[in-house]
Amino acid sequence: MTVDWWTIGLQVINVSVLIWLLSRFFWRPICAVISRRQQEIAAQLAQVTDGQKQLEADRAAVKEARSSFEQERARIVQQAQQEAQSERQAILAKAQQDAAALEAGAKQSIAQEEAENQARWRSDAAALSCDIAGQLLAQTGCCRPARETLFDRLLKAIATLPDRERLSLRDGFTFATATAPSPDERQAYESALMTAVGEHPVITWAVDPALVEGFAVKTPYLTVASNWQADLVRIREGLSHAGH
């Protein structure tokens, strides 16, 4: 068998040229496309990875926000419960205070009403007692020594008046008696009154049965009394205020 080295050489050259052509105009573009595609795929994978990371971060943020919301909700509910409890306690305390105030006011009103009733009863009882005593004294009359005592007391009351009031009696006054005096008694009373006043005033005589027994010196601005009616009034006032 004969080997044609020129043919083999030409074939080798052809194959080498073909390989060079393929590598230059076919494999390189294909490799470039494959490389570019690989880069795009890697970029997309990186984007997917970043997206997954972002999604995980978003999920974590949502979870954290949800946890924060739950904590805030629990805090708000607890605060609302505390405020409701505080308001309830305040309402109960206010109601208790109002009830205590109403009770105290009612007790005070009842006590005041009882005191007023007792005072009215004492006043009515004292007035009735003094009216009965006055009627009995008016019916039984007065003995001369008692009348003289009442007149002496009148003179002492005039003597103890302030100077201005006592001197005003010199301008004249009304001398009231429970019963009409006899001429001798009238003269004695007039003489004693002039001595007590210090001059000779004009005396207007009057009979006032309401005095029960005794005397009264009266001017438009002054009254000096020494009679049972005045004594009964003082006794009645004393009895009316005895329980105060």
From Swiss-Prot:
It holds the Pfam family ATP-synt_B. It is a single-pass membrane protein. CDD domains: ATP-synt_Fo_b. One of its GO terms (cellular component) is plasma membrane. GO terms for molecular function: proton-transporting ATP synthase activity, rotational mechanism; proton-transporting ATPase activity, rotational mechanism. It is found in: Cell inner membrane. It comes from the Bacteria. InterPro entries: ATP_synth_b/b'su_bac/chlpt (IPR002146), ATP_synthase_B_chain (IPR050059). Keywords: ATP synthesis, Cell inner membrane, Cell membrane, CF(0), Hydrogen ion transport, Ion transport, Membrane, Transmembrane, Transmembrane helix, Transport. The keyword Membrane applies. The chain crosses the membrane at residues 2-22. Coiled coil: none annotated. Belongs to the ATPase B chain family. F-type ATPases have 2 components, F(1) - the catalytic core - and F(0) - the membrane proton channel. F(1) has five subunits: alpha(3), beta(3), gamma(1), delta(1), epsilon(1). F(0) has three main subunits: a(1), b(2) and c(10-14). The alpha and beta chains form an alternating ring which encloses part of the gamma chain. F(1) is attached to F(0) by a central stalk formed by the gamma and epsilon chains, while a peripheral stalk is formed by the delta and b chains. F(1)F(0) ATP synthase produces ATP from ADP in the presence of a proton or sodium gradient. F-type ATPases consist of two structural domains, F(1) containing the extramembraneous catalytic core and F(0) containing the membrane proton channel, linked together by a central stalk and a peripheral stalk. During catalysis, ATP synthesis in the catalytic domain of F(1) is coupled via a rotary mechanism of the central stalk subunits to proton translocation. HAMAP family: ATP_synth_b_bprime. This is ATP synthase subunit b 2. The lineage of its organism: Bacteria, Pseudomonadati, Pseudomonadota, Alphaproteobacteria, Acetobacterales.
